[in-house]
Regions:
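Phosphate-group recognition and catalysis centered on beta-loop-alpha active-site segments
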Residues: 3-330
């Protein structure tokens, strides 16, 4: 464990990325076109989004493999849920998904919003976008504003998709090729918690796009990937063979403070940088601060100026952009 205290002006801010988590999701329901528009207006460098497939092999933008938590699917298609009461995206056509309306994310009980004080939970103003609609939106921004917002796309649930004979990674690469995303220099990252998905994209599909290995906890059951191994020096060296960066959970970077008030760091950022891997931790929220940060700006200072990460994923891109602008002014 590493203990660290450093002054506020330790690090220059150039090339630090602000990645808007599911759009400007602190202000509007996640994964909607409107949330993406707001993220662009807030000057986010990248738009983070998750993709899953429908029954008719269309990529839609949604975090979960089920429709329950963010749509009114139970009202529009009663009786269509599986034995566990879940509505899998792979069991619905795109036309059916387009009949749904998106609301603020539900809590795990489905009894109210996951985050109090955000956009009204009962509002049903929004719909589920397709990946291509997001791509067209970003292209439109480039033409009308002359500014590019990059894309930061996560492939969800490869194992479950395989059970339905669906291959979201292959479909994703084909769509991106049509929209001229081909090279490592293009403004796009593809991310996954599943190491095999990324290895297949790099080794079988020969993609040159930037890939990022997300790192979770083994107890989360996200994939067969051994995250404990990936957090080691040997594991990160292996990641560097197929990916360009890592996305650790922020609590895997900073674990708290010691009795003297110094930050306790795991050292994963230093190790990753040794292997030329970029580090973009997730997810920084104004309304979910860790114990070691008194304010959101304090949290940003810790990760940008002390830990020296290369970018952060946040529900509040405007606050992060303003922080970097203010730091640059000094």
């Amino acid at each position: 464990m590493i203990y660290l205290t450093l002054p506020y002006n330790t690090l220059a801010t150039q090339e630090k990325l602000i990645i808007a988590h599911r759009g400007a999701s602190g202000y509007l329901p996640e994964h909607t076109l409107e949330s993406a528009v707001l993220a662009f207006a807030m000057k986010a460098d990248f738009l983070e989004l998750d993709v899953v497939m429908t029954r008719d092999e269309q990529l839609i933008v949604m975090h979960d493999l089920t429709l329950n938590a963010t749509t009114n699917v139970d009202k529009i298609f009663p009786g269509r849920s599986g034995t566990n009461g879940k509505y899998l995206t792979m069991e619905f056509s795109l036309a059916e998904v387009k009949k749904l309306r998106v609301h603020e994310r539900s809590n795990k009980r489905g009894s109210g919003p996951a985050f109090e004080g955000r956009f009204p939970y009962e509002s049903l103003l929004f719909e589920v976008p397709t990946l291509e609609e997001i791509l067209q939106l970003v292209n439109g921004f480039k033409q009308s504003h002359g500014r590019v917002m990059g894309l930061y796309i996560e492939i969800k649930g490869a194992e479950i998709h395989r059970q339905y004979n669906l291959d979201p990674a292959k479909k994703l690469l084909a769509i991106l090729e049509r929209y001229d995303y081909r090279e490592a220099s293009d403004p796009i990252w593809i991310q996954s918690f599943d190491a095999e998905v990324l290895k297949t994209m790099r080794q079988k599909h020969k993609t040159r796009l930037k890939l990022l290995q997300l790192i979770g906890e083994n107890r989360w059951g996200l994939s067969a990937t051994d995250f404990d191994y990936l957090k080691t020096k040997v594991g990160l060296n292996e990641v560097a063979g197929y990916a360009d960066g890592i996305g650790p959970w922020m609590n895997q970077v900073v674990t708290g403070k010691n009795i003297s008030g110094d930050l306790k760091l795991t050292g994963i950022v230093t190790m990753a940088h040794h292997f030329n891997l970029k580090v973009h931790p997730y997810t920084m929220r104004v309304d979910r601060l860790p114990d070691y940060a008194e304010t959101f700006e304090d949290l940003l200072h810790i990760f940008f100026n002390l830990v020296q990460v290369d970018g952060i994923i946040t529900d509040y891109p405007d606050r992060a952009v303003k922080f970097l602008e203010k730091t640059a002014d000094h």
